[in-house]
């Protein structure tokens, strides 16, 4: 497991001891190696965790983290904007607490100065670790999870990408993501295993343009519509929040094409188990369904329906989508996204509405 994790570390939420072996973690759920972010790019602690220990941590400068109150003497973004030498937060998003690498974050931290990452090097770190893993395991079957951080805030790409997109840091970060994918593909080809490697590229949610930092992403978006023809975006129960890109590549088995088969990322678990001929243990992955043929382009239908529960309940069969009543907000002003919540039942024909 390499890159953005955001699945939690330790069983003490908000009370982790970051200065030793952090458990539970990736090794407790089957990963033999991990090099991951402790949380997300916009949250403290801003450090790499390799095999559940913080990288480059000086034992004489231990890390302390709090999401409740600041540490005396540690400057905050909201109080010291002059220290925000790279990015400033958008108003009212909450990214105005601890300052790391000239960017303020969510949460408070002190210590660990030697272990702190530099945002402009995050993509290089993830890519180098992924390529090295491929090189070291090219002669044996392997599973590699790579979670990129490029589109996630704060967007501060490496200088070699800055200004190349004409769309500011967000556009430059997407070019950086494209480079990462190319480097990983190149490593597979160099190792001679690209033809028989199954690659799944997808996103964990729909797009959000302004998600907490004043990077001019909205201003420089131009006519580009990252949400396509759909309503909503990240945080939304509408299609732009729940329908995400997915590219499956396996040259030895998958023919090029486009499929509208209805699947869920949750189905990858049962489907990959089926591919390996290993039935799931009783009680494992109860929501996961074996739709291997849909992922491989052999079944163009997929699921009969998919359910999402994320504040609101929705059920879709690919043609119709039902959204249950909810008391949640209908619109997120800070991110300019329709959330899809309504006190009334909603039913949409996805091909006509």
Task: Show the residue positions of the predicted features.
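Catalytic-site neighborhoods of secreted/periplasmic enzymes
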Residues: 1-112, 324
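C-terminal cap/loop subdomain of S1 sulfatases and analogous C-terminal strand-loop tails that border
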Residues: 13, 19-41, 56-57, 207-215, ...
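Loop/turn elements at helix/coil->beta-strand transitions in domains of secreted/extracellular proteins
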Residues: 29-32, 137-144, 193-199, 243-244, ...
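Active-site His/acidic residue clusters
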Residues: 50-53, 128-172, 208-210, 214-217
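Anion-binding catalytic surfaces of enzymes that hydrolyze or transfer phosphate/sulfate esters
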Residues: 85-154
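Short glycine/proline-rich turn/loop motifs
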Residues: 104-115, 159-164, 249-253, 351-352
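The substrate-binding groove and active-site-proximal loops of carbohydrate-active enzymes
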Residues: 112-124, 163-176
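Metal-dependent active-site segment of extracytoplasmic phospho-/sulfohydrolases and closely related
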Residues: 178-214
């Amino acid at each position: 497991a390499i890159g953005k994790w955001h699945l939690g570390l330790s069983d003490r939420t908000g009370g982790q001891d970051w200065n030793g072996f952090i458990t539970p973690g990736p090794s407790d759920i089957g990963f033999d190696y991990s090099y991951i972010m402790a949380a997300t790019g916009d949250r403290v602690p801003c450090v790499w965790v390799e095999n559940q220990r913080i990288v480059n941590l000086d034992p004489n400068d231990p890390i302390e983290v709090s999401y409740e109150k600041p540490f005396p003497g540690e400057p905050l973004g909201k109080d010291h904007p002059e220290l925000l030498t790279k990015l400033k937060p958008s108003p009212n998003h909450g990214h105005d607490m601890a300052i790391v690498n000239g960017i303020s974050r969510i949460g408070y931290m002190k210590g660990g100065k030697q272990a702190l990452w530099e945002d402009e090097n995050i993509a290089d770190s993830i890519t180098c670790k992924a390529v090295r893993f491929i090189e070291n395991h090219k002669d044996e079957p392997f599973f590699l999870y790579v979670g990129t951080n490029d589109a996630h805030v704060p967007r501060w790409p490496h200088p070699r990408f800055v200004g190349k997109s004409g769309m500011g840091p967000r556009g430059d970060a997407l070019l950086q993501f494209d480079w990462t994918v190319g480097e990983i593909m190149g490593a597979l080809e160099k190792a001679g295993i690209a033809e028989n490697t199954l690659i799944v590229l997808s996103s964990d949610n729909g797009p959000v343009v302004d998600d907490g930092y004043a990077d001019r992403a909205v201003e420089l978006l131009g006519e580009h519509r990252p949400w396509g023809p759909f309503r909503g975006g990240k945080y939304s129960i509408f299609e732009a929040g729940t329908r995400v890109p997915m590219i499956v590549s396996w040259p030895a088995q998958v023919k090029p094409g486009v499929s509208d088969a209805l699947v869920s990322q949750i189905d990858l678990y049962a489907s990959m188990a089926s591919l390996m001929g290993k039935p799931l243990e009783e009680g494992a992955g109860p929501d996961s369904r074996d739709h291997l043929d849909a992922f491989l382009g052999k079944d163009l239908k997929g699921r009969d329906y998919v359910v999402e529960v994320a504040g609101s309940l929705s059920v879709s069969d690919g043609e119709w989508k039902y959204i249950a009543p909810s008391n949640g907000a209908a619109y997120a002003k800070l991110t300019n996204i329709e959330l899809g919540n309504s006190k009334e039942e909603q039913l949409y024909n996805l091909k006509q509405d």
